[in-house]
């Protein structure tokens, strides 16, 4: 193994980029970049039945969107390819043959039904299910008999007995497994395709992967992979297993959990910013020194320290994600946020599909009103409902404000001045409200609150003159006149 840091993210194209997998990719990326190493993407595509047609493309597209630029993969061969497992059979086969020749592996002809019956019997006896080794020492005659029956063999690794497999995990510390608790396991399925634990160990060795950083659901795979390294006399990589991501009930994040959006694609569609999602995911199971929580990608690369990866489960806090994205939204120029929000405004029929310059100008003003409040671009639709829907029935507090003694006088003056106002723009509207204040003597909350309630139906909201401009003269006058 070389001294250079080389890590890999190895997705299967059986689904879209999940938050958990994105975190695995991100921590591998930060680790590699912090040490000036290589971030490799390898595609584990041997499960042909489950592979999605656009699964691979989607993985790459979303990784690129997040800012996780890879150094090697199917599109950037650096001499360690092929980068798809399905194209590496020529690498696996000689090694399979070697294990068979050295009696470190053997052919097993047991049927699925026989294996299932064994498993059920073990569970009924209260035992941990494991292969009992029935075909570990077949004679040549027995093998020929099974093949004459048309049985297709799998190939099993012969697990050494009474051996302890230990590794120093960069997150969890020392972890040990007793080989007697692990049955002889399948390295090649009946269809000739190598299994995950066999192929991944071979690939990591030949690609000179120095560190394997992944979720702690892979801990139980590690001894099997170490067995393969030892069988060939290779040095294993360093391992690091990150803690689980949990939901509000502190249960493992499940793809069936409808309370949390779990795919990067969904956040893109809602109008989240990639740098905000990067920032949020980087804090799922890792923490910097100090209290600061907003960092650029470059800052994360500089400060990343694998020793600060947490052993405790990482809580997926939806409110925290909204807050982080809002911090980035506030820093963006209005045009960037408007372009992110425009598809949402069009989809909600709030702006025509082919907008005029006037429509676009109005949309930019709407975004300027709400940019500081927006948690994501798509939120502009629910935030700005008052611009498109009929006035809601007033609540008790709003009703109290609008029933104030001075309200009819205030509304009469304001209606008259706004009706004559040209251009109907925020700066002029602000002046007009000041004139009404002077003429009526009504000021402070008694002035602003009734106007806000009358035109928006709400007690709070963005800058009042800007809100009135965006609502437009006709709508504002219609809403004011009922309180004159």
Swiss-Prot record:
Belongs to the class-I aminoacyl-tRNA synthetase family. Glutamate--tRNA ligase type 1 subfamily. It is an enzyme of class 6 (ligase). This is Glutamate--tRNA ligase. The keyword Nucleotide-binding applies. A motif ('HIGH' region) lies at residues 11-21. Keywords: Aminoacyl-tRNA synthetase, ATP-binding, Cytoplasm, Ligase, Nucleotide-binding, Protein biosynthesis. A motif ('KMSKS' region) lies at residues 252-256. The keyword Repeat does not apply. It comes from the Bacteria. Its main location: cytoplasm. One of its GO terms (molecular function) is tRNA binding.
């Amino acid at each position: 193994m070389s001294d250079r840091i080389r890590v890999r993210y190895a997705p299967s194209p059986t689904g879209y980029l999940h938050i958990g997998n994105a975190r695995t990719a991100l921590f591998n990326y930060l680790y590699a970049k912090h040490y000036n190493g290589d971030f490799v993407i390898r595609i584990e595509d041997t499960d042909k039945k489950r592979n999605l047609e656009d699964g691979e493309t989607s993985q790459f597209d979303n990784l690129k969107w997040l800012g996780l630029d890879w150094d090697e993969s199917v599109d950037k061969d650096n001499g360690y390819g092929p980068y798809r497992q399905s194209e590496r059979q020529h690498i696996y086969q000689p090694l399979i043959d070697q294990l068979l020749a050295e009696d470190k592996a053997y052919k097993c002809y047991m049927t699925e039904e026989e294996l299932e019956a064994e498993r059920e019997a073990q569970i009924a006896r209260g035992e941990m299910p494991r292969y009992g080794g029935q075909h570990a020492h077949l004679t040549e005659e027995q093998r020929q008999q099974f093949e004459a029956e048309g049985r297709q063999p799998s190939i099993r690794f012969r697990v050494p007995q009474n051996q302890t497999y230990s590794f120093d995990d960069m997150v969890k510390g020392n972890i040990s497994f007793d080989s007697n608790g692990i049955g002889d396991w399948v390295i090649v399925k009946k269809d000739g395709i190598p299994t995950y634990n066999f192929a991944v160990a071979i690939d990591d060795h030949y690609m000179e992967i120095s560190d394997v950083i992944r979720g702690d659901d892979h801990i139980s795979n590690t001894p099997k992979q170490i067995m393969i390294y030892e069988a060939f006399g290779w040095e294993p990589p360093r391992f690091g297993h990150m803690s689980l991501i949990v939901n509000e009930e502190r249960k493992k994040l499940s793809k069936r959990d409808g309370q949390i959006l779990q795919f990067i694609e969904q956040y893109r569609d809602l109008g989240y910013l990639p740098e905000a999602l990067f920032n949020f995911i980087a804090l799922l199971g890792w923490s910097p020194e100090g209290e600061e929580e907003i960092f650029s990608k470059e800052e994360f690369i500089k400060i990343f320290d694998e020793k600060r990866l947490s052993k405790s489960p990482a809580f997926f806090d939806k409110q925290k994600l909204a807050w982080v994205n809002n911090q980035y939204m506030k820093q963006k120029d209005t045009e960037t946020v408007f372009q992110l929000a425009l598809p949402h405004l069009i989809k909600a029929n709030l702006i025509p599909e082919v907008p005029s310059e006037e429509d676009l100008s109005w949309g930019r003003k709407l975004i300027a009103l709400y940019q500081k409040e927006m948690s994501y671009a798509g939120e502009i639709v629910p935030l700005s409902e008052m611009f498109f829907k009929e006035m809601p029935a007033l609540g008790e507090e709003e009703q109290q404000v609008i029933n104030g003694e001075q309200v009819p006088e205030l509304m009469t003056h304001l209606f008259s001045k706004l009706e004559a106002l040209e251009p109907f723009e925020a700066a002029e509207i602000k002046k007009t409200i000041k004139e009404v204040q002077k003429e009526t003597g009504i000021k402070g909350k008694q002035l602003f609150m009734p106007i806000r309630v009358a035109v928006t139906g709400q007690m709070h909201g963005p800058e009042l003159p800007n809100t009135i401009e965006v609502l437009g003269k006709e709508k504002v006058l219609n809403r004011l006149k009922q309180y004159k």
